[in-house]
Amino acid sequence: MKPLRLAFAGTPDFAAASLQAVLDNGHQVVAVLTQPDRAAGRGKKLQQSPVKQLAHSQGITVLQPENLKGEAIHQQLRDLNLDALVVVAYGLIIPQAVLDMPRLGCLNVHGSLLPRWRGAAPIQRAITAGDTETGNTIMQMEAGLDTGPMLLSESLPIGDSETGGELHDRLAAQGARLLVTVLQDLEKYLANATPQPDEGITYAHKLSKAEARLDFRLPTGALYNRIRAFNPFPVSWVPLNGQPMRIWRASESPQPAQANDEPGYILSVDDQGIHVATGDGSLILEELQLPGKRRMAVSDLLRGNPTLFSVGEPLGDAIINESGDHSGNA
């Protein structure tokens, strides 16, 4: 198949992997759409998205509309005379008028095995749910949220200790590879597209920092999965003196729960880490980040602060009362 005339819409690192793969395989990317530069970091300086940085390095025209609703951006896209628009983690709604513009429509790389985990955060939701596998789906876009016909999918096992960041990187590479495969014979894949099944639909709602606050009344496995899933964003935490203490890494303890163990209280502190009671056992916290400090292994942290955590005391302000309110603020 001859090289396609494409535009690419994407924003984060996950999307940049796909853009690089498309460029490496000789397709003509005539424009890149990415979200406007956003203020980020402590200095709140404007940051270019990874996709914009890659596009600039390749001399590709970059478009950064606040949305895709206006006639001006519609005319710009019509003038590109596209064979297809590739959309990967763009972050803006694609209206029907834009979906209808390219000759062969719009394609999307989605980091799950659809219809499971439609939506914004499929990678993290798969881990929090305790899924043992996930994958990527290349689909033809339509107006619904990740509802379009599937062109190609491939599964990927989730490691027992894999973090959201680690799984993200493996899925980004897999998605890029599958995208290139589809683009090599796009019309054949479109002709053989498969509707998504009506069974097994779940939604991967957007992540928030508030939900990353740990409730130690949950089972150990659920807490462990949350800590893995939310590394490196939004990062699990509990309040310590009114500020978030981040929990980067933990492991499940084999010790069963004791009748008098109160969730959120420290059971022991040793070379493994801080053993904290949960709803059905205990969790070993192995890497923490105190407010305003860098992340550290608990063993290193305790060398400089041996009395920071005391057995029989709650972990920071981690206790939640029976009404569901937290005893501390963040």
Swiss-Prot record:
| GO MF, any single term | methionyl-tRNA formyltransferase activity
Give EC number(s), comma-separated. 2.1.2.9
Instruction: Give the Pfam families listed for this entry.
Output: Formyl_trans_C, Formyl_trans_N
- Sites where the protein binds (6S)-5,6,7,8-tetrahydrofolate: S112, L113, L114, P115
The enzyme class is transferase
UniProt GO cellular component terms: cytosol
Q: Which CDD domains match?
A: FMT_core_Met-tRNA-FMT_N (cd08646), Met_tRNA_FMT_C (cd08704)
Supply the alphabetized keyword list. Protein biosynthesis, Transferase
Write down the chemical reaction(s) this protein catalyses: L-methionyl-tRNA(fMet) + (6R)-10-formyltetrahydrofolate = N-formyl-L-methionyl-tRNA(fMet) + (6S)-5,6,7,8-tetrahydrofolate + H(+)
Job description of the protein: Attaches a formyl group to the free amino group of methionyl-tRNA(fMet). The formyl group appears to play a dual role in the initiator identity of N-formylmethionyl-tRNA by promoting its recognition by IF2 and preventing the misappropriation of this tRNA by the elongation apparatus.
Q: Which family does it belong to?
A: Belongs to the Fmt family.
The name this protein carries in UniProt is Methionyl-tRNA formyltransferase
